[in-house]
Amino acid sequence: MKFGWIKTTGNDSEERIDSVKDALESSIPGILVKREEINSVRELGNIKIVSDSLDADVVLINKGEDLEILKSAKLSGKETAVYVVINTKDDEIYATEVSKLDFVDYVILEGSDWTIIPLENIIADLFGEEIKLVSVVTNVKDAEAAYEILEKGVDGVVLIPKDINEVKDFSKLIERMNSESVKLDYATVTKIEPVGSGDRVCIDTCSMMEMGEGMLIGSYSRGMFLVHSETVENPYVATRPFRVNAGPVHAYILCPENKTKYLSDLKAGDKVLVVNKNGETRESIIGRVKIEKRPLFLVEAEYNGENLRTILQNAETIRLVGEDGKPVSVVDLKVGTKVLIKPDENARHFGMAIKETIIEK
């Protein structure tokens, strides 16, 4: 996962504290601050503090300072970082060497001229090492380049922002860099029938979803259906753009990092994957899970000769995603209707994808 921090800017403490507020409002997880401002930052909110103090969450030293400070910090349970300004080849060598120390968690690299920072060399030298490389940049365009350099890119970026808009753009970039892409395809509906009542799960998130977005849900790991969010206007109830009426308690849901969970295991604070009709994804936090007894519908579909099934609430407001990415209500499904699914050849063990023969029916 790529991450991003902000370095506070401004000529006085008030300006720098404003940078902290900007970071918090934009969900930036960490910030570099002066040691004398640590307490003021903690009063503003919960954010990872990086500073040259043992009171920080990440204890920072500059090149040439005593590495024993970081050893002590590590023993006390802190994360550690070394800040290196790259001006010469010797600086590059130093950065590579400290990156291999087992008590250093982050190496933060700043170049006097971004265009000639030898990040490529350092990334190549440290391939396979546990260290997290962080690049200091002054604009979002350079941040994107740093994340992507040599395909692997740096693990994190420290942005020195000009204003709040740049901080917001940086936050969006981090979200985009961490978004997963899933392959979707069409399956053909072969059966729709009511099956009686059962306990179904509504997932209310902390995000507003858009038309074409939903979550991947299914009875089988080998094929999950894109269940549309409640964003479609209808004459019966108001829209709930934050909600997906997902299905019964037994069903799988696709979560971040290609993991699955049972719907019955979800709770407030968990992260789920919101997926759109193009397979683009973003993470969303669950605000509430509601489990209620409701009438249910079996949906069966065929994909490449295999039968896939899921069960959904029997209600007009529950929709899958049909051809052209348009939502189609379960009450309007017919034999032959095409619906979007995520095919998967892997089995699942405690939510993890594994190569194993498994029969689901």
Curated annotation (Swiss-Prot):
Reaction(s) the record says it catalyses? 2-amino-2,3,7-trideoxy-D-lyxo-hept-6-ulosonate + NAD(+) + H2O = 3-dehydroquinate + NH4(+) + NADH + H(+)
Record's Pfam families?
DHQS
Into which EC class is this enzyme placed? oxidoreductase
Which EC number(s) does UniProt give? Answer: 1.4.1.24
Q: What intrachain disulfides are recorded?
A: none
What terms describe the molecular function in GO for this protein?
3-dehydroquinate synthase activity; dehydroquinate synthase activity; NAD binding
**Which family does this protein fall into?**
Belongs to the archaeal-type DHQ synthase family.
Name of the protein in its database record? 3-dehydroquinate synthase
Which species is this UniProt entry from? Methanococcus maripaludis (strain C7 / ATCC BAA-1331)
